[in-house]
């Protein structure tokens, strides 16, 4: 018997290896590889609830619920294993199956893993037992869903939403929900005191290490660093070492994003920590900038004006102010001569751009937008740090801030998407405000659509369930540190590009833009409604509510000029009256995170982004797996497959007739980035935290610094909070192609193949680190005293040799300024 099992194991492994490498060209091979991986793992997972409890009972925080309802749970799990929902899960492809077994399924005694069925049972059981434990939470759920009465009906409510994947949870929740003494918070933010060597030691070894040990992504404010005279690069390397230690051999790698304001005297050294040519770079962490509005105004209006730099110990209250108060303090310090250096603001901007193009970061956030749109006044205690993915915004000086995340799988909200009966709201039961809203979006499907429309009712049901899931996570996920009472929630989405494509639209078509706003307005409205119900019945109102803007009838969209509402203002007014009367359980609601992990499980596109590619690869903990665009292949005609495979699924490379047929599957790099920025602005009034808004540039566009700089300015002008999460560059030469397209290569004349060398397709060659000591050092000296005796810029005449400090060709542009060497450089 053992020999038979061994032979079967070897055969399955060989078949999987042969099929998984065809995933980007053959969707059936991808599905079959995933199903075979589930079959391969069948002997190493739990099969019955009794076996599951025997293996994992010592790990549960509430074993009683599972023991009490063992037979009923067995019935539910067995029925799920025979259902269309389970069939869809195991048919989601190889990468989906790999993510389950590699990351999410809990491992017990002797290496035994929970099965996919028991994984969802654990998540739903945690939510159900927590809901039953807190009488107020259960009362709120019964007010929202009056048909729910028994404990098992509470379980069914969560189980069917989770297994139908309308609600997708964060990685910490999927890995640890129901496990005793686990941290379920997704994000941690801290702005520690870094003014002395002792403070830095405490922050790193007493606090940061603990957060990383609990597998949380961390955002750290480091603007206060450097007051002890030490270089910021030393601090960054210490943080990087922490991250690398905790990630060694770890299933779920974690990281840190360090945030600084650009007036800091060591801003250039901070940027250099991520440059690839820096031999002391910090690859394990990310950098971010909280940029004041003044910086963008000066760059746009007077780009060669000076930007002054300050030692943080002489910077007064700059770190704690924003807006006009910041500007007054900045110019007061300049007038008082408190600055320690100055630099052309354009040179600093292009240093930021240079770093973004080469390293993908720094993340860039607009300080005024982040603080001015917060639910309370932050003047004098302004936040200047975000989380790891730049979408969670909370003050984190006085105490550590946390946030619990979940997201809605938007393709499951299409009218024709199969759902369990309990996941659909009855027309006559539930929250009267939600029942007053339309069930369907008024936008009509386009030509070639396979969807019959978008169900706003399903979206609201999913959002309501996600709000209850996060409430369970907050109430029972131990510990959530000092910020548990703030009950910060971040609901995001995945699969927005899939929805647009299935409805027959390109990502930036007018119907897409209309539905884009409608989706997030309904999510924000539903989250507020549900949070108010939970607050009323649990009698847990977040601290500071009475002093918050919400207590005065405010909504986040009030601060955004020209906001068009699809929900009638009269219904918004009724919600406002309810909130003023009953309060809110949560202090924050919508945060659009990247969702890259859970989107691999569902097989949908990431977050709210356009398709990244129709054929790509994804590096997991154990291997580099192919990731096909499943929506794309659902729409591809059989007679077009060969042509599409020859170009790796790139629509822009197809002949015109074929290109027109598949235009809605253009990638993010094919779209005008200003259109994508505008769509982020359209949904911004309903995103009370922020959105991980990335920019997608082709290599030839990224070679001109003005391209990215202009996009950053445009995002500032539109008032986005996160101006840029990540800068992604599409290489002109695709080095990621894993299958040789011999026939395609033969069809191209040899002289055309050799027309451009790989070197000609690269970005400008980076300078050697030794050549650049940083503009701060230059500006501290007089003319002709920079590195190598070169000059410093002044007035409108800019020495081209100075520009060569940053680039050897067009990375910095003259924009019409005189290009000649000055006397000290000739």
From Swiss-Prot:
NCBIfam families according to UniProt: NrdE_NrdA
Gene Ontology MF terms in the entry: ATP binding; ribonucleoside-diphosphate reductase activity, thioredoxin disulfide as acceptor
Record site: Important for hydrogen atom transfer: 187, 403
Family to which the UniProt record says this protein belongs: Belongs to the ribonucleoside diphosphate reductase large chain family.
Lineage: Viruses, Duplodnaviria, Heunggongvirae, Peploviricota, Herviviricetes
Binding locations of substrate: 171, 186-187, 217, 387-391, 594-598
InterPro entries reported for this sequence: HSV_RIR1, NrdE_NrdA_C, RNR_lg_C, RNR_lsu_N, Rrm1
UniProt function note: Ribonucleoside-diphosphate reductase holoenzyme provides the precursors necessary for viral DNA synthesis. Allows virus growth in non-dividing cells, as well as reactivation from latency in infected hosts. Catalyzes the biosynthesis of deoxyribonucleotides from the corresponding ribonucleotides.
Catalytic class of the enzyme: oxidoreductase
Name assigned to this protein: Ribonucleoside-diphosphate reductase large subunit
Recorded superkingdom: Viruses
Annotated S-S bridges: 187-403
GO biological process, one term: DNA replication
Residues annotated as site: Interacts with thioredoxin/glutaredoxin: 822, 825
Residues under site feature: Important for electron transfer: 725-726
Active site: 387, 389, 391
Keywords: ATP-binding, Disulfide bond, DNA replication, Early protein, Nucleotide-binding, Oxidoreductase, Viral latency, Viral reactivation from latency
Pfam families: Ribonuc_red_lgC (PF02867), Ribonuc_red_lgN (PF00317)
Listed EC numbers: 1.17.4.1
Catalyzed chemical reaction(s): a 2'-deoxyribonucleoside 5'-diphosphate + [thioredoxin]-disulfide + H2O = a ribonucleoside 5'-diphosphate + [thioredoxin]-dithiol
């Amino acid at each position: 018997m053992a020999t038979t099992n061994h032979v079967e194991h070897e055969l399955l492994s060989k078949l999987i290896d042969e099929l998984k490498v065809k995933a980007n060209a053959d969707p059936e091979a991808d599905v079959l590889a995933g199903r075979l991986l589930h079959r391969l793992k069948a002997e190493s997972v739990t099969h019955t609830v009794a076996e599951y409890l025997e293996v994992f009972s010592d790990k549960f925080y509430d074993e009683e619920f599972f023991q009490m309802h063992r037979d009923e749970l067995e019935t539910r799990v067995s029925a799920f294993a025979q259902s269309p929902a389970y069939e869809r899960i195991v048919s989601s492809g190889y990468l989906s199956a790999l993510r389950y077994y590699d990351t999410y399924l809990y491992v017990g005694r002797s290496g035994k893993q929970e099965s996919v069925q028991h994984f969802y049972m654990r998540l739903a059981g945690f939510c159900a037992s927590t809901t039953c434990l807190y009488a107020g939470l259960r009362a709120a759920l019964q007010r929202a869903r009056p048909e729910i009465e028994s404990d098992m009906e509470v379980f069914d409510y969560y189980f069917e939403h989770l297994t139908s994947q309308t609600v997708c949870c964060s990685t910490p929740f999927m890995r640890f929900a129901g496990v005793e003494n686990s941290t379920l918070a997704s994000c941690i933010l801290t702005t520690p005191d870094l003014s002395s060597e002792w403070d830095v030691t405490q922050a790193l070894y007493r606090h940061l290490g603990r957060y990383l040990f609990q597998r949380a992504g961390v955002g750290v404010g480091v603007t206060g660093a450097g007051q002890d005279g030490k270089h910021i690069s030393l601090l960054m390397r210490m943080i990087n070492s922490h991250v690398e230690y905790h990630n060694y051999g770890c299933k779920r790698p974690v990281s840190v994003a360090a945030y600084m304001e650009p007036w800091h005297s060591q801003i250039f050294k901070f940027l250099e920590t991520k440059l690839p040519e820096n031999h002391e770079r910090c690859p394990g962490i990310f950098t971010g900038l909280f940029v004041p509005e003044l910086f963008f105004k000066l760059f746009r209006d007077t780009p060669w004006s000076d930007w002054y730099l300050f030692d943080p110990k002489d910077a007064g209250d700059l770190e704690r102010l924003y807006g006009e108060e910041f500007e007054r303090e900045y110019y007061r310090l300049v007038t008082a001569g408190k600055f320690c250096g100055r630099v052309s603001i354009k040179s600093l901007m292009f240093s930021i751009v240079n770093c973004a193009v080469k390293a993908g970061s720094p993340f860039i956030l607009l300080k005024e937008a982040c603080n001015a749109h917060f639910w309370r006044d932050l003047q004098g205690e302004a936040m200047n740090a975000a989380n790891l993915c730049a979408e969670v915004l909370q003050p984190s000086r006085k105490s550590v801030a946390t946030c619990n995340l979940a997201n809605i799988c938007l393709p499951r909200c299409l009218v024709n998407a199969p759902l369990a009966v309990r996941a659909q709201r009855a027309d006559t039961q539930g929250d009267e405000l939600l029942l007053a809203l339309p069930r369907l979006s008024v936008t009509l499907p386009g030509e070639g659509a396979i969807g019959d429309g978008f169900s706003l009712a399903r979206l609201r049901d999913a959002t309501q369930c996600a709000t209850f899931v996060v409430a369970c996570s907050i109430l029972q996920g131990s510990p959530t540190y000092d910020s548990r009472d703030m009950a910060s929630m971040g609901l995001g989405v995945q699969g927005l590009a899939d929805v647009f494509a299935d409805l027959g639209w390109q990502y930036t078509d007018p119907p897409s833009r209309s539905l884009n706003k409608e989706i997030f307005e309904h999510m924000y409205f539903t989250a507020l409604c549900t949070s108010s119900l939970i607050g009323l019945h649990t009698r847990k109102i977040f601290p500071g509510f009475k002093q918050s803007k919400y207590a005065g009838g405010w909504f986040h969209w009030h601060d955004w000029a020209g906001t068009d509402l699809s929900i009638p203002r009269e219904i918004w007014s009724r919600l406002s009256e309810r909130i003023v009367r009953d309060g809110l359980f949560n202090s924050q609601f919508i945060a659009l995170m990247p969702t890259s992990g859970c989107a691999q499980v569902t097989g949908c596109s990431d977050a709210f982004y356009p398709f990244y590619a129709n054929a790509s690869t994804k590096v997991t903990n154990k291997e580099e797996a192919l990731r096909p665009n499943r929506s794309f292949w659902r729409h591809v005609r059989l007679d077009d497959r060969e042509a599409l495979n020859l170009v790796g699924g790139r629509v822009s490379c197809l002949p015109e007739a074929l290109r027109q047929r598949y235009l809605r599957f253009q990638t993010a790099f094919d779209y005008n980035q200003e259109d994508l920025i505008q769509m982020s602005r359209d949904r911004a009034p309903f995103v009370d935290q922020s959105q991980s808004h990335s920019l997608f540039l082709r290599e030839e566009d990224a070679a001109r610094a003005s391209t990215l700089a202009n996009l950053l300015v445009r995002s500032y002008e539109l008032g986005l909070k996160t101006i840029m999460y990540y800068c992604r560059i599409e290489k002109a030469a695709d080095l990621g192609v894993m299958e040789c397209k011999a026939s395609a290569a033969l069809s191209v004349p040899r002289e055309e193949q050799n027309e451009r060398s790989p070197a000609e397709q690269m970005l400008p060659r980076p300078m050697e680190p030794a050549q650049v000591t940083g503009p701060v050092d230059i500006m501290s000296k007089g003319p002709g005293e920079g590195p190598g005796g070169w000059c410093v810029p002044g007035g409108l005449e800019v020495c081209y040799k100075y520009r060569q400090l940053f680039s050897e060709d067009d990375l910095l542009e003259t924009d019409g300024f005189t290009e000649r060497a000055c006397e000290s450089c000739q």
